[in-house]
């Protein structure tokens, strides 16, 4: 994952396989980060590494009594705690603060999404250059822009399972990944029986996958 050897060191890959370490370490994010350190560093450095750690911390903190605290309040508390892993000067930290400010301003999520696109994909602010560095798809698989998009769905979804994954899917870029990240996290928080009630139908207990 060294930037000198791997031009893809800030793509989204690491978060897809390391979030689960947070669930392996209930309420102990420090140990979760220790367990996940090597798996992250096989493919990610710098912002992609910090973003992966953000998601791991979120998952580690997802153990709580839903009768004692509202899911929305807990989600925001978890996010604020995970924000501390992002160096303040990094573009990932600035993306977090930018999206949170948009949410707090009351603008619709669609407007926040367009503002994110303009600031980072078009204007390339905060030293975010993947939209031009990656000529294959303007950085559509980059950890950064997908992190920003995932925060839009996290904040505007406000802990609502369906709304969160809807917004995540509609934000674009590599949108199946933020949707699966928050779908997995909220699914764990709500539990299987509650998810079944949300969709009011029998859920499959098997999943078949193949590679072409």
Predicted regions and their residues:
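Long, well-ordered alpha-helical segments
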Residues: 25-34, 190
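Catalytic phosphate/nucleotide-handling subdomain of diverse soluble enzymes
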Residues: 44-47, 54-56, 60, 149-212
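Short sequence/structural elements of tandem HEAT/ARM alpha-solenoid repeats
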Residues: 30-35, 72-73, 197-201
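Hydrophobic, membrane-interfacing alpha helices
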Residues: 12, 48-50
């Amino acid at each position: 994952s060294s930037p000198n050897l791997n031009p893809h060191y800030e793509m989204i890959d690491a978060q897809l396989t390391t979030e689960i370490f947070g669930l392996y370490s209930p309420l102990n994010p420090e140990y979760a980060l220790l367990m996940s350190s090597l798996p992250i560093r096989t493919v990610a450095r710098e912002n992609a590494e910090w973003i992966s750690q953000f998601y791991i911390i979120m998952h580690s903190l997802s153990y709580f009594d839903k009768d004692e605290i509202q899911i929305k309040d807990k989600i925001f508390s978890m996010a604020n705690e995970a924000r501390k892993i992002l160096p303040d000067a990094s573009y990932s930290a600035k993306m977090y603060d930018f999206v949170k400010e948009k949410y707090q301003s009351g603008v619709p999520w669609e407007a926040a999404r367009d503002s994110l696109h303009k600031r980072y994909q078009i204007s390339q602010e905060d030293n975010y250059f993947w939209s031009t560095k990656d000529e294959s798809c303007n950085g559509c698989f980059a950890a950064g822009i997908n992190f920003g998009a995932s925060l839009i769905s996290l904040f505007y979804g406000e802990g609502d399972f369906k709304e969160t994954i809807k917004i995540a899917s509609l934000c674009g870029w590599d949108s199946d990944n933020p949707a699966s990240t928050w779908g997995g996290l909220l699914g764990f928080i709500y539990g299987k029986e509650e998810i079944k009630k949300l969709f009011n139908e029998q859920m499959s207990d098997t999943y078949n996958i193949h590679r072409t």
